[in-house]
């Protein structure tokens, strides 16, 4: 005899479902279940919460803890066998979908000098943020980009792309960021391996940054109609310079310090339709106020050290550490140095939230905008 309860989510609030189980109703619910249907009022309060309830939890992944394990994978598997030699970040609340937070995937990939992964394409949008090493490169639809530390490169939905490290380089580690969980949730994922395993470089090396990377300039013959940025590679040096210059003439955001978004130079919008990226600078000693918003965010420390408080938990971070902020979680950041700035790279699903009209933001009102640490 089943003891299933159907009134678990009752709420004694006007306008909300508040139906108590009775023998007659339970029998009715079972009849509906046999027809592969159900009574909305038994689940309405669950599937339409008062506010977002993320299954993800805040996590800090320390690079000093992960690095040796990432490097060890080199001795255990080859790129040819693994496809992509990656240690992925698995949020305790999202292990069922292999997500780092929300619907975002992240992992650390390593390659030795002279290694190259096979060219492939997939429905997921992706980016790579270089953490250490020199000589890394990525080829996207025949465009080859050379990469240095703190550069990041796009490998958009549907593009042929591959990664490698030149024979003259050093062992490289980078962070992968993809929307795999989102694409799979939408049941829209495809994957393909290039028929030749490697693609030909059909354009001058670093041509796209050269064509599209001019500050405030657009090439006269620059025709681009694809839904993602043609820039492909976003370099650290000009990004950091822009942050520093901006910090000298503005107070910045009370919640994010000096925040700048990477953009598609054609549209001024996000770099890809489903993944946004940004870089923010915290001045020496700066501590932001807390706020929360819809959307999942993954941060990597590009420079400096400090801490973030996420839903009352303090996470101390330093360069190359990675941490996540789940949707609708209060968070604030602080630079621990009194003399040097700190810089955080971030990728997120903000474009999805905004394009679907789901973005909401709220500042913490009490305690002068700062959370109590639990």
Give residue spans per PLM region.
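Catalytic core of Fe(II)/2-oxoglutarate
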Residues: 144-147, 159-178, 313-318, 322-352, ...
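C-terminal structured domain segments across diverse proteins
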Residues: 266-269, 275-279, 291-294, 304, ...
């Amino acid at each position: 005899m089943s003891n299933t309860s159907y009134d678990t989510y009752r709420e004694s609030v006007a306008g909300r479902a508040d139906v108590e189980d009775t023998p007659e109703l339970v029998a009715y619910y079972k009849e509906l279940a046999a027809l592969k249907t159900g009574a909305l009022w038994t689940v309405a309060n669950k599937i339409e919460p008062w506010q977002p309830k993320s299954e993800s939890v805040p996590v800090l992944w320390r690079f000093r803890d992960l690095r040796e394990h990432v490097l060890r994978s080199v001795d255990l598997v080859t790129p040819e066998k693994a496809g992509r030699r990656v240690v992925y970040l698995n949020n305790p609340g999202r292990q069922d979908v292999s997500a780092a937070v929300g619907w975002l995937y992240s992992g650390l990939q390593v390659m030795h000098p002279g290694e190259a992964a096979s060219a492939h394409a997939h429905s997921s949008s992706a980016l790579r943020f270089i953490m250490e090493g020199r000589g890394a490169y990525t080829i996207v639809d025949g465009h080859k980009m050379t990469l240095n530390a703190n550069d990041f490169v796009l490998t958009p939905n549907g593009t042929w792309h591959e990664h490698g490290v030149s024979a003259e380089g050093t062992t490289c580690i980078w962070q992968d960021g993809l929307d795999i969980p989102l694409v799979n949730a939408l049941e829209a994922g495809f994957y393909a391996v290039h028929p030749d395993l490697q693609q030909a470089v059909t354009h001058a090396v670093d041509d796209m940054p050269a064509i599209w990377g001019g500050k405030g300039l657009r090439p006269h013959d620059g025709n681009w109609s694809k839904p993602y940025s043609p820039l492909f590679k976003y370099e650290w040096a000009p990004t950091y310079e822009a942050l520093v210059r901006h910090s000298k003439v503005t107070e910045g955001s009370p919640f994010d310090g000096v925040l700048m978004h990477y953009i598609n130079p054609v549209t001024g919008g996000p770099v890809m339709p489903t993944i946004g990226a940004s870089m923010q600078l915290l001045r020496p000693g700066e501590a932001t106020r807390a706020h929360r918003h819809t959307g999942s965010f993954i941060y990597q420390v590009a420079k400096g050290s400090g801490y973030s408080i996420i839903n009352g938990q303090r996470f101390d971070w330093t360069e190359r550490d990675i941490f996540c902020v789940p949707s609708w979680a209060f968070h604030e950041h602080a630079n621990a140095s009194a003399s040097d700035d700190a810089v955080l790279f971030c990728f997120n699903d903000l474009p999805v939230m905004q394009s679907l009209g789901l973005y909401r933001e709220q500042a913490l009102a009490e305690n002068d905008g700062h959370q109590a640490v639990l």
